[in-house]
């Protein structure tokens, strides 16, 4: 008997993703540090390998390492851009016919292959530049954006009421926060106690268990309910894919189409800033004047991941007294405040306090996805989440590349500039949401609008 709960797969995937990101960044940082100069890291040291005295030659050396790591991250992200875009869009779009499990399985295979390669890279001390090739190959199988998009579509398929969608998506974000918080908190101890090799092996093992669960235990309601036998050539499949995307916007009324585009713009611009700035936090914390070690970086990651929990609680409480759009405003403006505080953080206490305004950072992600799902038909959910995942993949890679490039160019004269820039960019989704509000956003009215359009389409077909 198949299980219709995707939460265990999300749990394992979130653990692997959260542990992979800081481990890979710090592994590359140490490799570049050791290969650039004659300085080595002391694995049992309680302080970071960081020099605060600007007149010291080590200070100039660590600034050079920061630039090299930022540029390497840029190269690695760009290498997976094109294959990631193509695979994400195709896999999630065809999930409406072939089931949500297919993109989950393929993206899990790619993640497992990448983690195994990280183990080999670390154990045999291969050139770390080979990470670029593994990123490029792994992106063909889809990435974590593909996996999350399939999971959210899987959940929406099971939700009948609109409020249930918001709460269920918030529950998933809460689960993500719980896992990422605990994993982030322990990531520094993984490095210190087990080293990089064993840590990467644990990641590979968790992804293998995740793949087994999806293959043999997870059911697929879309595939089970689908009775049509799709037999078409590859070219016809691509044509049908893009045709369905085109019809998603064409079949909508003018007001609904405008709202759909505006909400997509809001979602992607907010995603662009939050995802783009995320890797900079670790580099910022490793550099002077903070000079954090791997344990403090783990504490910072855990505190940042607490926003998943607080965002879930916020959505759960706010949903009884305010609309979705007001919750999104709260998340955007508190995140903006956190960016400004981070830009001026010069001590450990200030950096921890700067994390406090990020408590509702995840709220706009959950709320905007829910708002988008409410303005499309139930038969268009798969293609909608394919569009979202495609834009998130494009925006995510572009954002990380852009912010890494900006940080590399500005770290020497003002490391906090990138955070001030991100705070300014958050005005874009805020303004976009104001326009949505001015169109008299009302959840119930758009539900009725969709029903009216569906009945009109049915009558047209009957004629």
Curated annotation (Swiss-Prot):
The keyword Heme does not apply. GO terms for biological process: cellular response to 2,3,7,8-tetrachlorodibenzodioxine; vacuolar transmembrane transport. It is a multi-pass membrane protein. This is Lysosomal proton-coupled steroid conjugate and bile acid symporter SLC46A3. The keyword Ribosomal protein does not apply. Keywords: Glycoprotein, Lysosome, Membrane, Signal, Symport, Transmembrane, Transmembrane helix, Transport. Gene3D superfamilies: MFS general substrate transporter like domains. GO terms for cellular component: lysosomal membrane. It is found in: Lysosome membrane. Its main location: membrane. It catalyses: estrone 3-sulfate(out) + n H(+)(out) = estrone 3-sulfate(in) + n H(+)(in); 25-hydroxyvitamin D3 sulfate(out) + n H(+)(out) = 25-hydroxyvitamin D3 sulfate(in) + n H(+)(in); cholate(out) + n H(+)(out) = cholate(in) + n H(+)(in); glycocholate(out) + n H(+)(out) = glycocholate(in) + n H(+)(in).
